[in-house]
Design a protein with these regions (language model features):
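Helix-loop "lid/cap" segments that line or gate small-molecule binding pockets
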Residues: 105-109, 119-130
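Flexible "cap/lid" loop of the alpha/beta hydrolase fold
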Residues: 76-112, 140, 147-159
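Catalytic His-Asp charge-relay segment
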Residues: 165-169
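Gly/Ala-rich beta-loop-alpha elbow adjacent to hydrolase catalytic centers
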Residues: 62-72
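Short, flexible active-site-adjacent loop segments at beta-strand->alpha-helix junctions, enriched
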Residues: 65, 91-92, 127
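Conserved HGGG/HGGXW glycine-rich cap/lid loop of the alpha/beta-hydrolase fold
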Residues: 1-48
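Active-site signature of alpha/beta-hydrolase-fold catalytic machinery across serine-
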Residues: 30, 73-77
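Structural motif
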Residues: 14, 58-60, 84
Length: 169
């Protein structure tokens, strides 16, 4: 997992944002007064360096889409001073027919991923032309191969029954 500080000014509070699949540090910009900000992305490797956060007194966690699963798994044993945790359009069961993405759809996404299918995916995700135009200005610069590897890695990790005890507010 990549952990990228978009704002690091030695504040006592931190916004820790776990993005969805395929994103990078360009995906969003948060500039809240008295908060540092760290963006987590690329779940090809789920290793999480908790030492980055040892000096914070309060951490607000946000998980979006696949980031809900990534945050749930990585934060459950970190013992960080989490003040609040907000899950946005995601699940701790990312590849599951009833509570996540149908495994057949997930596999087809891996098998058929290319520039055109990614564009179609992003348009559907955004929901409107206006949202899509905004998203494109801030979209990930990662390669198709990188995105595919991330999906394959997530699929492999989920098959290992990586259940979580992390609690969302």
């Amino acid at each position: 997992m990549k952990q990228y500080f978009t704002k690091q000014e030695n504040n006592k509070s931190l916004i820790l944002f776990f993005t969805g699949w395929g994103m990078d540090q360009n995906t969003l910009s948060i500039n809240k007064k008295d908060f540092d900000t760290c963006i987590c992305f690329d779940y090809t490797d789920i290793d999480f360096e908790k030492s980055h956060y040892k000096n914070y007194q309060a951490i607000d966690v946000y998980g979006w889409s696949m980031g809900v699963w990534a945050a749930s798994y990585t934060l459950q044993s970190c013992n960080l001073p989490i003040r609040k945790s907000v899950a946005i359009n995601g699940t701790i069961f990312p590849i599951e027919k009833e509570r996540g993405i149908d495994p057949i759809i997930f596999q087809k996404t891996i098998d058929l991923l290319n520039e055109q299918s990614l564009l179609k995916f992003n348009k559907r995700m955004c929901g409107s032309k206006e949202n899509f135009q905004f998203f494109i200005k801030h979209s990930s610069l990662r390669s198709i191969e990188s995105l595919k590897q991330e999906l394959i890695s997530i699929q492999s990790m989920v098959k290992k029954d990586m259940t979580s005890t992390f609690q969302w507010d």
